[in-house]
Amino acid sequence: MVKTLRPQNYNEAIYVGHFFRTGMPVVMDLNGLTDDEAKQFVDFAAGLVFGRGGDMDRLSPKVFLLMPHGRGNRVPTVEEAP
């Protein structure tokens, strides 16, 4: 199961952290945010993923997959795709 979140403001970052820390992959759809707000979320998510030993992949310009450590395979990047 993957949790998809479409935050409306930075106060909702707590939900990204909550689901990720419980071991659930999280898709962050940041299309509803300004570029500055989206950057804050990406910075938060990068720290979260680094600290917990997971992976973060960009699915589109403002959509990211956060994969907890030990939860399956990464999504191949454009460079890695066949």
Language-model segments: residues:
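Positively charged, small/polar-rich N-terminal and surface patches that mediate targeting and assembly
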Residues: M1-T34, D43-P82
